[in-house]
Structure formats: structure tokens, C-alpha cells
Amino acid sequence: MMVNRKILTLDEFTIQQMRAFPHATGELSNLLRDLGLAAKRINVEVNKAGLVDILGDAGEINVQGEDVKKLDVYANNQVMGVLKHGISCAGIGSEELDDFIAFDDPVSNNSKYVCMFDPLDGSGNIDVNVSIGTIFSVYRRVTPKGQPVSREDFLQAGINQVAAGYIVYGSSTMLVYATRRGVNGFTLDPSIGEFSLSHPNIQCPEFGKIYSVNHGNFFQYEKPVQDYIQVCQQKTKETGGPYTQRYIGSMVSDLHRNLIKGGIFMYPATKDKPKGKLRLLYECNPFAFIVEVAGGKATNGKVRILDIVPTELHQRSTLFIGSKGMMEELESFLQRENA
Ligand code: P6P
């Protein structure tokens, strides 16, 4: 009987990757599978969020008799739970937690990875049914194994990432992750309850026709950014356009679209957020890693995102990220300013 080997599940893919590296311990594969499990559980709740909200408003108790939790707190608990009870993660940092957590048990203290994540980015979009996502970033700890992790294990430059990825809860639910060997996308197949390889070896097109920015802040942006945006608005067929502006206010969705189709996403400095809005460690770094492995570029307007050495867990950064050719055109405007 022929076994269908055409479509690999996430588990099969990570095991195949591990087999390609005889010295691999399997810890990273286990960690990615743990994150996939958390994503499946979050997906169930996200898909019925509207219903739960209505029931939750009625009396704070949902149909299962559970206390209605905020969905992003729920998502945080799911990701933290699978990593804490797994065998591959020594500690975590999360958008939902003030400080990092060292799991500090004998198994976890001997794990070689730490993970940072935004458990449910864009959760403000849930009540209007806009796609949202989970973002994660994996590093090898820098302190010796056998002891609890410390802050320096988390404050590493993004270039040290071992893996990074996201889950987008959209028209379908997809998990996309990158290692230095490539970027691969897996679509959740409800018929078997598994993420199945649907987008092997994702490459970000060198040029695209989509620019993503919040036009509501236009007059707060520095002049080179304004100048570049106006160039985008004036592109013609002859100059690589015409461009279209797409911005749905959910980073995972905007960046997933631009990764697949080509495009540029910008979150520049504004008056009330002079250092940018997006978080370096668990929003900018993971996407910068993914986009660079896929052939794109990511900077804060001055330096490569992955080269920034963080000083705080929740520090913010400006972000310009996307297709290599579009980023280089933007950089030609920014360099004039810097010059
Ligand atoms: P603004 C969502 O709140 C988020 O963190 C990202 O997902 C999104 O790209 C950005 O903020 C949108 O911010 O200020 O344009 O609404």
C-alpha cells in the first residue's frame, strides 16, 4: 500500500530535518512541535472568540463552566505551559509577562534553548474578526546548562536566533518558521489536526507592489520616510508600480502577506513613540530573521535589526522590513538624511 509521503506534517518535517543533522539532539524539533501544539489549542479559542465574548459578557462564565479569560492571557498560558512541561526550553520571555521566567527545574535547567514570544499579537482586532497571530523567537542559552537561565540569556542580538516563527490565525491557520536552513510554512489541516507542509522554502520576492504603513501618522514621520511613501504613491508601470497600500493593523498578517507576495512594511518613529511601537525581542527580531533567511532585509532605519544588542526585554524599535529591492530604495532616502 502506498503511503502518502507527499505532504509532511510539522512533526515529520522536523524529524526529517533532524535526520539530516546526525549530531542534532532533537531539542529544537521538540520545541517546535511543542509550539505547534500550543498553536492548535489557541486556534480553537480564537476561532470561537466572538461566541465566548458574548457568553463571557453575559456572566463571565462560558458554556464549559470555565472562567472567561482574556484571550491573550489564555494564549500566553498555553505557550508557557507547553514550553515549561517540555524538555527543550530553560526559560521564557513574553509580551504578557513583566519579566523573564526561569523554569528552574532539573530538566529545564539542562535545556539549551530559551524562547521569547508575543502570544497573541494584534488581539485588539479579535472583536472585528481581523486575523491575529503568535510570534516566537528561539535562542541558545549563553549561561552554562545545569543552572537557571538569567537575563543575559534573553538580551541577545537577533543574529543569534536559532529559529523564529509565527502562527497566523486567518482564513486558514498557518505556522511559518525559519532556521538558517530556510523558511517553511505549514497549514493546519483540520481533517487530521496537524500542521502540514504547504509552503516549502519560502522566498521573499526581491520586489513587490505592496507598501504597508499607517497613513494616519504620515505627518509625524521624518521627511525621508514621507518622501519614500510619496514615491510609492507615484509608482507607475514604467517604474515598477503601480503600488497598492495594504495595512490591516495586525503585524503578523501584514508581514505574512508581504513575505509571500513581496512588499515593504514600515513602522517609523512617531511623536508619541519616538523609539517606535513594535517590540524588538519578540516582534521585530523574529520577523527580521525570517525575512532575511527568505532573502529580504530589515532595519530600524539606521542599522540592521538583527545587529541591535538589546538592553531591556520589552524595548521598542522602529521597523522597516521586506523585499530587498524595495528596502534598498527606501535606504537610499534614509541615507540622504543620515548624510
Ligand atoms: P498602529 C497591533 O497592536 C500591533 O502591535 C501590530 O500587530 C500592528 O502592526 C501595529 O500594532 C499597528 O499599530 O499604531 O498602526 O495601529
PLM region spans:
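Alpha-helical scaffold segments that form or flank carboxylate-/histidine-based iron centers
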Residues: 66-69
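IMPase-like, lithium-sensitive Mg2+-dependent phosphomonoesterase catalytic core
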Residues: 2-53, 60-62, 73-339
